[in-house]
């Protein structure tokens, strides 16, 4: 993953920590399947229905995870999203 121009390595512990921060905050959304997509791709295709997340925002998990990790100085400055 790139942040600015810096490459960041993400491992399972990062994913587990993010899941812990999101526990009880993010809705559990379903994973959907499509036989048509499977046939066209020649593989099993899974769709995570994040559009069913709070506020219909598919980026809720990432945004929330980033905001709760803000330092006190970053919290005073705030965040802008569009």
Regions found by a protein language model. Give the residues of each.
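PLP-dependent amino-acid enzyme catalytic core
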Residues: 2-82
């Amino acid at each position: 993953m790139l942040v600015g121009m810096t490459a960041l390595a993400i491992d399972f512990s990062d994913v587990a920590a993010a899941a812990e921060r999101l526990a009880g905050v993010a809705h559990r959304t379903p994973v959907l399947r499509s036989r048509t997509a499977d046939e066209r791709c020649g593989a099993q295709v899974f769709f995570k229905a994040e559009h069913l997340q709070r506020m219909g925002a598919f980026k809720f998990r990432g945004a929330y995870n980033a905001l709760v990790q803000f330092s006190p100085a970053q919290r005073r400055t705030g965040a802008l999203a569009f």
